[in-house]
């Protein structure tokens, strides 16, 4: 059974993520310890809230370097919601530099007549990396749950693993590269499709990346 470090930096409720992981057969461990993060089979960086406080909390807990080391080591890593955004270089929402794992920035949805910002509720994913193991056996264009006013805009469009269309704006909803995958939506709130995504991370993504790293 895989042990997954769920990083705690005071940015959101971690327990719903942990429940989803337990249903998928993993053992989640909420932690802000670099030692526990290093020992885990995989790492999840969740998050709800604003960009600047998130990166400030990570840095005051001395978690920036351990996160970068884990990703560089090849260990499976999943970012969720704000945990996706802070992997980028900067955000229109704040002044703090992000972690810079991905080149690009975080942008706010542009206003449109009749468009609600934040996007809050269910929307369809369009896969741009349909062969990614995270999407295995889910079917095309699954409905997943979003709550966000900002989206990531990668410099390299090849890292985009899925998109979502809100109003007339089609934006990145997930990125994937090597051992790193991160999603804007909340799999833990996305019913059957979301639980399957977490299950795929546990049963397919983790074993593959651990095998490659060994």
Curated annotation (Swiss-Prot):
- Report which reactions are catalysed by this protein: 5-[(5-phospho-1-deoxy-D-ribulos-1-ylimino)methylamino]-1-(5-phospho-beta-D-ribosyl)imidazole-4-carboxamide + L-glutamine = D-erythro-1-(imidazol-4-yl)glycerol 3-phosphate + 5-amino-1-(5-phospho-beta-D-ribosyl)imidazole-4-carboxamide + L-glutamate + H(+); L-glutamine + H2O = L-glutamate + NH4(+)
Which keywords label this protein?
Amino-acid biosynthesis, Cytoplasm, Glutamine amidotransferase, Histidine biosynthesis, Hydrolase, Lyase
Entry keyword annotation includes DNA-binding:
no
Q: In which pathway does it act?
A: Amino-acid biosynthesis; L-histidine biosynthesis; L-histidine from 5-phospho-alpha-D-ribose 1-diphosphate: step 5/9
- E.C. numbers: 4.3.2.10, 3.5.1.2
- Entry's InterPro entries? Class_I_gatase-like (IPR029062), GATASE (IPR017926), Imidazole-glycPsynth_HisH (IPR010139)
Which terms under GO biological process does the entry name? L-histidine biosynthetic process
Localization of this protein:
Cytoplasm
Matching entries from SUPFAM superfamilies are given as: Class I glutamine amidotransferase-like (SSF52317)
- Active site residues per record: 81 (nucleophile), 186, 188
Describe the function of this protein: IGPS catalyzes the conversion of PRFAR and glutamine to IGP, AICAR and glutamate. The HisH subunit catalyzes the hydrolysis of glutamine to glutamate and ammonia as part of the synthesis of IGP and AICAR. The resulting ammonia molecule is channeled to the active site of HisF.
Oligomer status and interactors: Heterodimer of HisH and HisF.
What is this protein's record name? Imidazole glycerol phosphate synthase subunit HisH
Task: State the organism of origin.
Answer: Trichodesmium erythraeum (strain IMS101)
User: What is the gene called?
Assistant: hisH
């Amino acid at each position: 059974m895989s042990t997954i470090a769920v990083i705690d930096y005071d940015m959101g409720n971690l327990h719903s993520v942990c429940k989803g992981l337990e249903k998928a057969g993993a053992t989640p461990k909420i932690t802000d310890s670099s030692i526990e993060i290093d020992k885990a089979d995989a790492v999840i960086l969740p998050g709800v809230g604003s960009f600047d406080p998130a990166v400030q909390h990570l840095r005051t807990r001395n978690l920036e370097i351990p996160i970068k080391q884990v990703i560089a080591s090849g260990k499976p890593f999943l970012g969720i919601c704000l945990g996706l955004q802070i992997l980028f270089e900067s955000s229109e929402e704040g002044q703090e530099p992000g972690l810079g794992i991905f080149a690009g920035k975080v942008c706010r949805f542009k206003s449109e007549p009749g468009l609600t910002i934040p996007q809050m509720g269910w929307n369809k994913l369009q896969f741009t990396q349909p062969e990614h193991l995270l999407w295995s056996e889910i079917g095309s264009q699954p409905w997943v749950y979003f709550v966000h006013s900002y989206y990531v805009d990668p410099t390299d469009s090849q890292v985009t693993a899925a998109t979502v269309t809100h109003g007339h704006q089609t934006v990145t909803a997930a990125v994937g590269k090597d051992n790193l995958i991160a999603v804007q939506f909340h799999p833990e709130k996305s019913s059957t499709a979301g639980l399957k995504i977490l299950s795929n991370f546990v049963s397919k993504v983790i074993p593959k990346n651990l095998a490659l790293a060994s």
